[in-house]
């Protein structure tokens, strides 16, 4: 389990773009399960949509990408690197995410060859599928 302090040591993202609140399980270099608590105070709800707040799908995908990043950075070989979003396949949204929902984010690294990595990801709320996709990353060295 990783708290927000540990997550910030792994991911370069910060408020308002850090979309992982807690990691509840880690299978080193392979799989991560994390949580994003969606509150009524999220800035994106001011415009999406004021009278009908729905979490934008692209931010659900970003939360899944960040969860994948945590999985990739658990590998010692990837310390000091950053995963840059390189592509997405088969992305489907099945349910809206609204204030009060808790997103369960799952990412499993399926391929890691050189600087390219792929992950199967899915987000659920209370067991209901919200989103699933396959995400591709290009690993790059962080600037010194």
UniProtKB/Swiss-Prot annotation:
Coiled coil (UniProt feature): none
TM stretches of this protein: none
Enzyme Commission number(s) of this protein: 4.2.1.59
InterPro entries attached to this UniProt entry: FabA_FabZ, FabZ, HotDog_dom_sf
An annotated GO BP: fatty acid biosynthetic process
Top EC class, one word: lyase
Keywords of the record: Cytoplasm, Lipid A biosynthesis, Lipid biosynthesis, Lipid metabolism, Lyase
Biological role stated in the UniProt entry: Involved in unsaturated fatty acids biosynthesis. Catalyzes the dehydration of short chain beta-hydroxyacyl-ACPs and long chain saturated and unsaturated beta-hydroxyacyl-ACPs.
Protein name from the UniProt record: 3-hydroxyacyl-[acyl-carrier-protein] dehydratase FabZ
Originating gene: fabZ
């Amino acid at each position: 389990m990783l708290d927000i302090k540990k997550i910030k040591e792994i991911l370069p993202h910060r408020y308002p773009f850090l979309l992982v609140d807690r990691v509840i399980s880690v299978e080193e270099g392979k799989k991560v399960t994390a949580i994003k608590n969606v509150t009524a105070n999220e800035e994106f709800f001011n415009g999406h949509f004021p009278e009908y707040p729905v979490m934008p799908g692209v931010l659900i995908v970003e939360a899944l990408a960040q969860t994948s990043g945590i999985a990739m950075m658990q590998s010692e070989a990837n310390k000091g690197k950053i995963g840059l979003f390189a592509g997405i396949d088969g992305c489907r949204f099945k349910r809206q995410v609204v204030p009060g929902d808790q997103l369960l984010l799952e990412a499993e690294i399926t391929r890691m060859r050189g600087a390219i990595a792929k992950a199967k990801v899915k987000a659920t709320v209370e067991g209901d599928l919200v989103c699933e996709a396959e995400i591709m990353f290009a690993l790059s060295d962080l600037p010194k």
